[in-house]
Amino acid sequence: MIFIDACFKKPTPYTPIWMMRQAGRYLPEYMEVRKQAGDFLSLCKDYKKASEVSLQPIDILDVDAAIIFSDILVVPLEMGMNLRFEKGEGPVFDNPISTLEDLEKLDDQNAHKKLNYVYDALKLTREKLSQNKALIGFCGSPWTIATYMIEGSGSKNYAKCKKMLYQNPELLHKILNKLTQVLKLYLEEQIKAGANAIQIFDSWASALEYDKFFEFSFNYMLEISNFIKSKYPNIPVILFPKGISGYLDRIDGNFDVFGVDWSTPLDLARDKLSHKYTLQGNMEPCRLYDKNAIKEGVGKILKTMQNKAHIFNLGHGILPDIPVENAKYFIKLVQESSAK
């Protein structure tokens, strides 16, 4: 698998490519299946439909890896938190966590056993996927998941989380530790179900100041990665902490690929990290609105990463109103332009 080879810094015939949120709303085929499912969470829980939408970008765009269709918040959902998705405001937890008693009500022993719909989707997708295409499993970072559990929804300033971080850091560490133990088991089950690689999304990394990022986020991601790498050395682990270009000097640990978001200069990440890790990223998603912008962006990134281990991706998820034709053009351009 070209994607897996690139993760391990092995030579590849061209630069492999996939896109975050590639199974998503820009595809009419996805919208059709989502309509049949009824709503987003029902689609996540219907393993046949989740598998179908995971495979769509492979069939339509010929990307080099599929990522399983799911959501990072199915983990706290199965730990016992009441999750719903509100139109216009995204995920909502009706009973956010603010005390140790709230945390102790959550089931960390059986949560990973209740996520069979994710494992079934992985099994089915791996069966249907051609042998040269990789299947990526994923989870959110403990910090990013915790922000939703504590805030009760998305947040602009993470005031409740940060209040806890500075007033009651022990409680926040307990929440993060509980999540970390569940996520280890969850990812292990994903690997057993057929995931060839794992990505940990730390979408809200940039909410933390320098030293707090390493204490409350990065160290927990490394604990998960160390667990996976000790048991499954052939499974690459990708870390994607978004928006931390100022923190790259302290990035170190046992993982394989570092995801670079579009706000981080790729040459900076290359100079600081490419001797240790394959880099993934980092085209500005809005370039996909225009073919000239795509061409310019692709050329720039391929030049920056020449002779370095690289997986092409966007620097964040593809947007819902990107024309499919432009997405196809982007994928093909990367594969053809980077051919050795």
Curated annotation (Swiss-Prot):
Pfam families: URO-D. The keyword Lyase applies. Pathway: Porphyrin-containing compound metabolism; protoporphyrin-IX biosynthesis; coproporphyrinogen-III from 5-aminolevulinate: step 4/4. Its main location: cytoplasm. InterPro entries: UROD/MetE-like_sf, Uroporphyrinogen_deCO2ase_HemE, Uroporphyrinogen_deCOase. Belongs to the uroporphyrinogen decarboxylase family. This is Uroporphyrinogen decarboxylase. The gene is hemE.
